[in-house]
C-alpha cells in the first residue's frame, strides 16, 4: 500500500471521530467516536512502523498497548454510562449533571 493512502484513511477516520465527539449528545455515541479516534491512531502507528522501522516492532507493540487501554476505557466508560442511565434514565450528555443536586 502507498503511505499516503493509508494516512489519508487514518485522517478521515480521525476527522469523523472528532466530528462525532464534538457533535454527539449521546454518551454511548461519544464513546464510539473516541474508539474511532484511537483506531485511527493505531493505523498510524502500524503504518509508520511498517514503512520506517521494518526490523523492530515498536509501532505494532505500542498499537497493541493502545488497544488494551482502549478496551479498558470502553469497559469503564460503559459501566459509568449504565450507572448514569440507572439513576437518570437518560444517556444524554447535557442531562448528566450529577454534581449539582
Swiss-Prot record:
Main location group: plastid
A GO BP entry: ATP synthesis coupled electron transport
InterPro entries: NADH_UbQ_OxRdtase_chain4L/K, NUOK/Mnh_C1-like
Entries under Pfam families matching the protein: Oxidored_q2 (PF00420)
GO CC, alphabetical: chloroplast thylakoid membrane; NADH dehydrogenase complex
Cited PANTHER family: NADH-UBIQUINONE OXIDOREDUCTASE CHAIN 4L (PTHR11434:SF16), NADH-UBIQUINONE OXIDOREDUCTASE SUBUNIT ND4L (PTHR11434)
Biological function: NDH shuttles electrons from NAD(P)H:plastoquinone, via FMN and iron-sulfur (Fe-S) centers, to quinones in the photosynthetic chain and possibly in a chloroplast respiratory chain. The immediate electron acceptor for the enzyme in this species is believed to be plastoquinone. Couples the redox reaction to proton translocation, and thus conserves the redox energy in a proton gradient.
Name the record gives this protein: NAD(P)H-quinone oxidoreductase subunit 4L, chloroplastic
Organism for this UniProt entry: Solanum lycopersicum (Tomato)
Gene for this chain: ndhE
